[in-house]
Amino acid sequence: MTMTDPVADMLTRLRNANSAHHDTVSMPHSKLKSHIADILKSEGFIAGWDVADARVGQTLTLSLKFGPDRERSIRGIKRVSKPGLRVYAKSAEIPQVLGGLGVAILSTSSGLLTDRQAAKKGVGGEVLAYVW
């Protein structure tokens, strides 16, 4: 059975594993998910990620990041643009998450960018998710 929204599936798996204090979470691999994982790592939300061959296809494994007392580094994740309702933002209207404390992930003509990177480049695009 095909998945209608693989990004929402990724974010839901990440949210559930984070809530349960798991150290890692695995999911089917795609280039888009790898780029999202790159952004999450560069912004300090996850410790790292790895791609491994599975019986069918490849598996993306994210290593979650916790503080010294096992407090979560990810407080919340929200999928914004969905297959049934796409959400786009112009370069002048790029949303800020929690006044700049969180990150908006955008799909632009320059690839996947954070809200700050997109504003700096002056490009808009589809708002995929908010992470804080």
Curated annotation (Swiss-Prot):
A GO cellular component annotation in the UniProt record: ribonucleoprotein complex
GO terms, molecular function: rRNA binding; structural constituent of ribosome
Any Pfam family: Ribosomal_S8
Gene3D superfamilies: 3.30.1370.30, 3.30.1490.10
Keyword set, alphabetical order: Ribonucleoprotein, Ribosomal protein, RNA-binding, rRNA-binding
InterPro entries found in the cross-reference section: Ribosomal_uS8, Ribosomal_uS8_CS, Ribosomal_uS8_sf
The keyword Lyase is annotated on this UniProt entry: no
Family recorded in the similarity comment: Belongs to the universal ribosomal protein uS8 family.
Function summary: One of the primary rRNA binding proteins, it binds directly to 16S rRNA central domain where it helps coordinate assembly of the platform of the 30S subunit.
Entries under HAMAP family matching the protein: Ribosomal_uS8_B (MF_01302_B)
Quaternary context: Part of the 30S ribosomal subunit. Contacts proteins S5 and S12.
Protein name: Small ribosomal subunit protein uS8
